């Protein structure tokens, strides 16, 4: 029994088949616990990037003990309702965690939920893991932190992450990412109105000043609506953890 099967048996939960494939392919192994990770491990991982390596300090969770501890911690410390089964599979910056949500119809693949820790609430951000990967790959080149250590070899990094990720997308999704990743960085003017809510569908943060990216705010939103459509009505996507 591998660690994923142990989690499935413990919580009567079924990971998506694609997640098992990512596990078997070593795409969840970031070796985060090793000392001098940024100096020694990260440069090696960049050559064959694991799952969404360059996204918002994204770190896939591959330690079953850590996963179980997170599930139980969320139940006790965050007061998760009994009807929710949230199985964590990644963490991001500032304590945010991505989960599989075992919803009311367990015969369907679990949806992807992101817990925004500071807001004590979570939101459905993808109907399935494949669409979430598309969303992650798109977001990497939509919001670029100019001082990021990876920017010096930006084009090499995105070429590498496309190479290791495209087989987990649909053919059409992969073609869209390939076309965008072949672009050159462009300076875009700010398009957000001052009175506009900073968060919209997918909790998208529109740029509030001029920005550099491979695609504009408008194209980013259009592509997410087309290739990461969420079946849950917008008013029902966000729910409070406690």
Question: Which stretches of residues belong to each language-model region?
Answer:
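Intrinsically disordered, low-complexity segments enriched in Gly and acidic/Ser/Thr residues
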Residues: 162-196
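Short alpha-helical interface elements
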Residues: 32-33, 114, 154-157
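Generic alpha-helical structural element
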Residues: 8-11, 118-122, 166
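Charged, amphipathic alpha-helical linkers/stalks
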Residues: 145-161
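Compact, glycine/acidic-enriched structural inserts
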Residues: 110-148
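A surface-exposed partner-binding patch
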Residues: 1-105, 182, 190-242
């Amino acid at each position: 029994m591998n660690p994923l099967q142990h989690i499935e048996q413990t919580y009567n939960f079924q990971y998506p088949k694609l997640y098992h494939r990512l596990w078997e392919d070593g795409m969840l192994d970031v070796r985060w616990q090793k000392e001098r990770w940024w100096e020694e491990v990260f440069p090696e991982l960049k050559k064959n990037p694991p799952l969404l390596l360059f996204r918002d300090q994204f770190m896939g969770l591959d330690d079953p003990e850590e996963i179980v501890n997170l599930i139980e911690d969320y139940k006790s410390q965050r007061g998760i309702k009994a009807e929710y089964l949230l199985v964590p599979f990644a963490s991001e910056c500032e304590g945010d965690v991505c989960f599989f949500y075992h919803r009311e119809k367990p015969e369907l693949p679990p949806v992807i939920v992101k817990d925004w820790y500071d807001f004590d609430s979570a939101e459905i951000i993808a109907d399935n893991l494949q669409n979430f990967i598309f969303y992650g790959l798109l977001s990497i080149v939509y919001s670029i932190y100019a001082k990021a250590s990876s920017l010096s070899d930006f084009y090499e990094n995105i070429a590498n992450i496309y190479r290791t990720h495209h087989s987990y997308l649909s053919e059409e999704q992969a073609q869209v990412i390939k076309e965008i990743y072949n672009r050159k960085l462009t300076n875009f003017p700010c398009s957000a109105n001052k009175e506009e809510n900073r968060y919209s569908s997918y909790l998208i943060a529109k740029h509030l000043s001029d920005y550099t990216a491979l695609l504009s705010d408008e194209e980013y939103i259009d592509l997410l609506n087309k290739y990461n459509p969420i079946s849950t009505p917008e008013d029902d996507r966000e729910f409070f953890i406690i």
